């Protein structure tokens, strides 16, 4: 009886090892990295996770940009297609949202703070400088709805180092390749 228990245990262990080995082989990483491409086939970014892409500016600055699904008229998601996310805000030291742009930091370790705002010309990504936050005298805030004058001192802000119109530079729809 003891020999049968040992033999059965060995058979189960070998079978489990074979299944685990097969799973390990099936899940090996692709030799080609996953990339986000725009509607023209140009590289738009590399995924940090399913909705955060790392976009490289012409100046060499790398910053996170958010994507979201594209929906059909009935509210269903389009298969394999995405577009740039909007809905952020940028704080300015000027009263007309033209100079002194600042954004909040990122909750994700190791990436710059960014904001994406929808403008009449497309979705614009504002990328912060690397460093420590500061307190700024804010005179206006740019939202998707436009520029709003304010007068407030706000802490936790980073100066904007780079700006790119994502819709113009990487026109949607976007897809992973």
Predicted regions and their residues:
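Bacterial N-terminal signal peptides that target proteins for export
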Residues: 1-7
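N-terminal signal peptide c-region/cleavage motif recognized by signal peptidases
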Residues: 17-19
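N-terminal segment immediately downstream of the Sec signal-peptide cleavage site
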Residues: 23-79, 176-177
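Short coil-to-beta strand junction motifs in C2/discoidin
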Residues: 84-87
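Extracellular/mature segments of secreted proteins
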Residues: 89, 104-108, 152-159
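Predominantly extracellular/luminal cell-surface or secreted proteins
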Residues: 92-93
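An exposed acidic His-Trp-rich patch
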Residues: 98-148
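Low-complexity intrinsically disordered segments
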Residues: 130-177
